[in-house]
Design a protein with these regions (language model features):
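Short, hydrophobic-biased amphipathic alpha-helical segments
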Residues: 303, 307, 916-923
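Beta-lactam-recognizing serine transpeptidase/beta-lactamase-like catalytic domain environment
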Residues: 81, 130-132, 136-150, 154-157, ...
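Membrane-proximal periplasmic segments of bacterial cell-envelope enzymes
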Residues: 1-577, 583, 596, 704-711, ...
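Short, hydrophobic alpha-helical segments
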Residues: 438, 801, 927-931
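Short, gly/Ser/Thr-rich active-site loops of penicillin-recognizing serine hydrolases
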Residues: 821-829, 921-945
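Short, charged, low-complexity patches
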Residues: 419, 423, 427, 431, ...
Length: 945
């Protein structure tokens, strides 16, 4: 026994035996652990792993298209190439690739004058030392941490700064021939992690190739990189907290936040600001998907062939950067239809709350938070029809969230197509003619060829007021003339701050006041507008302005050749709207807003800068004017008063009323006929048709007053009750029924007067709110508190033209399935039918005919060259005593067989010539094909056996 023990002790002294025992013990532990994992807990871990590696990815369905009445495309999908980063593919740059990328970036930065890229914690000149800050203990800790981060072992922690530089030069293979400063730039880049080198390279190349980076970072993409929270401080704070900002960091402005993000993502210091912003856009998009790396991240869409070739050529370097195809939304007619179509965009939180409960036939959700949905117009209204059903791909991913394989897939189902009642050619003719006529009107003002003249001071004041010379951009500018003018503002107002609540208003007032007093010149304002890219000029033109050429002359030149729009000047009249319907169906043929916007700028890659400019534009291009701009109807209302008088027997078609100039029966202030106000004359005796021809206010004052006639005199309530009945018969008491969002009408009535008065004076007395004869007679000529949209007026004129049938207006004709079969159709809806006496209708029609054809008609020469007869009426409505009155024009055509009704409304358009009738005339010519010339005039005969 003793011998065995001695032998065992001898073995224990043998190193090989000890090592063998250790191996046996370790092997036993491994076997036991495997037994536990696979046998005892195998089922549990199997279920856990299976649940964690199966992920479902949506396959986007093709969105339905939108067409006009003839099948012309208005909203379609196009296929484009995009650059994506696939997080499931590992990026591991080798030594040579890292050197190539860092060298390329270094050479580019130095060639571009950026010599301060340096993230090394080492002084820039010999003798080199570390630049860590704090107590000795803190500095020692920082130094050790940094040395560990660059790959030094503990035994190398005593290396000096000079020795560390030498170590880095060798490790990162710093190119020969670089200066000391260039070497530091190179090292700052080469030491960045692989994702930063990739993002920096891509950001630089995408910018070089003219691409727009798809960006979710809520900072403007150009200096001064303002936040995109539209003043919502709660959203700003919440976002900052999501980026781990805290304490004082929550009060950082946008530029400090940019610096914070640069450090957060580990980008080198000293990089060009724009490159940092672009790179952060890429890094931030990847950061948002850090827990879903199986989902690719799109960083550029609709790329050029040059970008595609670059990505393909560098596939070995960046295997995680891929080219894919994507479906983009395209609006071929852009600004012509933007207010009707709207646009699509990735859904917001409020959108998701609206759509999250939508499910398909199997109960599966139809929407996810990353889906795009309609944000306005038809795109929003018919979202559920246009949106298809997404397909699915079931994939297997590893525990890092990276894609491994495809398990199963389901094909998507395309959305339905929507066909509108609108005629795109008619719409474009209306828009282009309206813009052309407004251009002519503004040019007359600037050149003194019209009734009113606009001075250079008025022109530039208008451009400041409408933000085409932006005070906001001026106070944010970092250089140029804008900065010089801003310094003038600071000298005049030392306490001014760009962050004060009324900063823009104060700056705008300073510019206008300075212009009037001469402390700010037209040249400075013109150069500001050029710097803000609100006016495109050649170098020669810019130099001529700098050398003293007339800014106004250049504006006139740009306006004349179409490089500048009338809306850009801000001078009245520079806005307008047109609405056209079929008189016998309620179909809308055209709905024009001017100025408009290009919805292509807001789809696919949302242009925040463009959208902010739209929001600040004083001409309100985002407003859908035909449906949401209400004005007093003026004399276009008089046909209703005429029919009310005729149908109630108050007058007959032959009844004459003598115009006395002043109408005194309704009390003071006395109402005046327009001709009396202008010339002191009168229209003399006129019947209803001739009263419409010359638009005699006195005739309709008298008629409105007579509608209240009783045995004891006049009853104003009786008169307005009668007028309200006929206003309702023409739809002026309700919405038009059109599918898009619209404002309701304001019909002059006792209830609406009381409401209006108490809105401004809650303590108004009964005598102040009661309805009077003065209210009635002013209602009879379309004034008082009457207020309607062009769509509502067109519905009224359409009803008049067809003899009394009130149709619900509609813009959608039918909806079609993806396979071409009919899904649904919008049928005509008759809301009311009023049986007017034929002789009464003819009397009113005759009056409207005389407007364009009578010897005294207000438009007797406007339609001379049109081969068809037109029934029309004009109207004006005053809103601001310092500006021209609004002008209305309504008509239906042809006179002997009415097919279409047209309304043109031009705010502040009185005295600008006849733009509205010219627009209507162009519409009639297009609709009736009067300018159509066959492209093939050769008669062809086809013989069939």
């Amino acid at each position: 026994m003793r011998r065995y023990l001695e032998h065992f002790l001898d073995l224990c002294k043998n190193r090989i035996f000890v090592m063998l025992c250790g191996v046996i013990v370790l092997f036993a532990i491994i076997v036991l652990r495997l037994f536990s994992l696979q046998i005892i807990h195998g089922e549990y871990y199997d279920e856990s792993i299976t649940a964690s590696v199966s992920k479902t990815l949506p396959v986007a369905a093709s969105r339905g298209n939108i067409y006009d009445r003839y099948g012309r495309p208005l909203a379609v999908n196009t296929v484009a190439y995009c650059v994506q980063v696939d997080g499931s593919v590992t990026l591991e740059l080798n030594r040579e690739e890292r050197k190539t990328l860092a060298t390329d970036l270094t050479d580019w930065l130095w060639a571009d004058g950026h010599h301060k890229v340096d993230s090394l914690p080492i002084t820039t000149s010999s003798p080199y030392s570390f630049t860590f800050k704090g107590t000795d203990e803190e500095k020692e800790k920082q130094e050790k941490s940094w040395k560990a981060s660059i790959g030094l072992e503990k035994k190398q922690y005593k290396l000096s700064a000079t020795e560390c530089l030498k170590y880095l030069y060798e490790k990162y293979d710093v190119p020969e021939g670089y200066t000391a400063a260039q070497k530091r730039t190179y090292l700052s880049l080469a030491m960045s992690d692989d994702r930063n080198l990739m993002a920096l390279t891509l950001a630089r190349k995408l910018s070089e190739f003219g691409e727009t980076i798809d960006d979710e970072l809520p900072l403007d993409t150009e200096a001064p990189y303002a936040f995109q929270f539209n003043g919502n401080t709660n959203r700003e704070k919440s976002w900052k907290q999501s980026m781990l900002m805290k304490g004082k960091e929550l009060n950082y402005n946008s530029r400090k936040t940019l610096d914070y993000l640069r450090d957060f993502f580990g980008l080198p210091e000293g990089l060009p600001e724009q490159l940092v912003r672009d790179t952060l856009g890429i890094r931030y998009s990847l950061y948002l998907k850090r827990y879903q790396q199986y989902q690719t991240v799109t960083i550029a869409t609709d790329i050029s062939d040059k970008t595609l070739a670059y990505v393909e050529e560098n596939q070995d370097t960046f295997p995680n950067v891929v080219i894919d195809t994507v479906s983009l939304r395209d609006y071929p007619e852009g600004e012509y239809f933007s207010h009707i179509l709207g646009y699509i965009r990735q859904m917001t939180e409020s959108d998701y709350a609206l759509y999250k409960d939508e499910v398909d036939a199997d109960g599966n959700p139809l929407y996810s938070q990353t889906d795009v949905v309609g944000q306005d117009g038809m795109e929003k209204l018919y979202e559920k029809e246009l949106n298809g059903v997404d397909g699915k791909v079931l994939i297997e991913v590893d525990n890092q969230g990276r894609r491994m394989s495809v398990i199963d897939s389901t094909e998507p189902v395309a959305g339905k197509d929507v066909f509108l009642t609108l005629d795109s050619k008619l719409q474009k003719v209306a828009y282009d003619t309206l813009e052309s006529e407004l251009r002519t009107a503004v040019l007359r003002k600037l050149t003194g060829g019209g009734k009113t003249y606009a001075s250079s001071t008025e022109l530039f004041t208008s451009m400041i007021n409408t933000n085409h010379i932006s005070a906001q951009k001026m106070i944010q500018a970092e250089d140029g003339v804008q900065k010089q003018v801003y310094q003038k503002l600071k000298q005049a107002n030392p306490t001014f701050s760009p962050t004060q609540d009324d900063a823009v208003a104060v700056a705008k007032e300073f510019l206008i006041d300075g212009l009037e007093k001469g402390s700010i010149s037209l040249k400075e304002l013109m150069l500001m507008m050029i710097e803000q890219e609100n006016l495109s000029v050649t170098e020669e033109e810019k130099t001529s302005i700098e050398n003293g050429a007339s800014p106004t002359a250049l504006i006139i030149k740009k306006l004349s050749n179409g490089e500048m729009s009338p809306a850009d000047t801000g001078l009245d009249p520079c806005t307008g709207s047109v609405f056209v319907t079929q008189v016998g169906t309620g179909e809308v043929l055209a709905s024009v807003t001017y100025p408009s916007y290009d919805n292509n700028e807001l789809v696919n890659t949302f242009n925040n800068a463009y959208y902010n400019d739209l929001l600040q534009d004083g001409n309100t291009p985002l407003v859908n004017r035909p449906l949401k701009q209400k004005k007093a109807s003026g004399s276009t209302f008089k046909m209703i008063t005429a029919l009310a008088g005729l149908e109630t027997g108050t007058i007959t078609p032959s009844t004459t009323i003598v115009d006395k100039g002043l109408f005194k029966d309704a009390g003071v202030p006395y109402a005046r006929c327009w001709i009396y106000s202008n010339t002191g004359g009168t229209h003399g005796p006129v019947n209803v048709s001739h009263a419409l021809e010359v638009s005699c206010n006195y005739f309709f004052y008298e008629l409105g007053y007579r509608l209240g006639s009783t045995a004891n005199g006049s009853d104003s309530n009786k008169a307005i009750t009668t007028l309200n009945e006929y206003m309702a018969a023409f739809g002026l008491n309700d919405y038009t029924g059109v599918e898009l969002d619209e404002y309701g009408p304001t019909m002059a009535s006792p209830a609406n007067k009381e409401k209006a008065v108490k809105t401004f004076n809650p303590d108004a007395t009964t005598s102040q709110t009661r309805w009077t004869d003065g209210d009635t007679i002013r209602t009879a000529i379309g004034q008082s508190i009457n207020s309607y949209t062009p769509a509502q007026i067109t519905k009224y004129v359409s009803t008049l033209a067809n003899g009394g049938t009130l149709y619900k207006l509609h813009m959608v004709d039918h909806i079609q399935n993806a396979d071409g079969t009919l899904h649904s159709e919008v049928e005509e809806t008759v809301e009311n039918v009023t049986k007017f006496k034929e002789e009464n209708l003819q009397a009113v029609y005759q009056g409207m005919y005389l407007v364009t054809n009578g010897s005294r008609g207000t438009l007797r020469t406007a339609f001379n060259d049109l081969p068809v007869k037109v029934a029309a009426k004009t109207g004006t409505a005053e809103e601001d005593k310092n500006r021209s009155s609004h002008t209305w024009f309504v008509c239906f055509a042809p006179f002997d067989d009415p097919q279409i009704a047209i309304t043109v409304m031009i705010p502040f358009g009185e005295g600008s010539g006849t733009p509205a009738p010219a627009v209507a005339k162009a519409i009639i010519r297009e609709y009736l094909g009067l300018d159509y010339t066959p492209t093939n005039t050769t008669m062809q005969t086809v013989l069939a056996e």
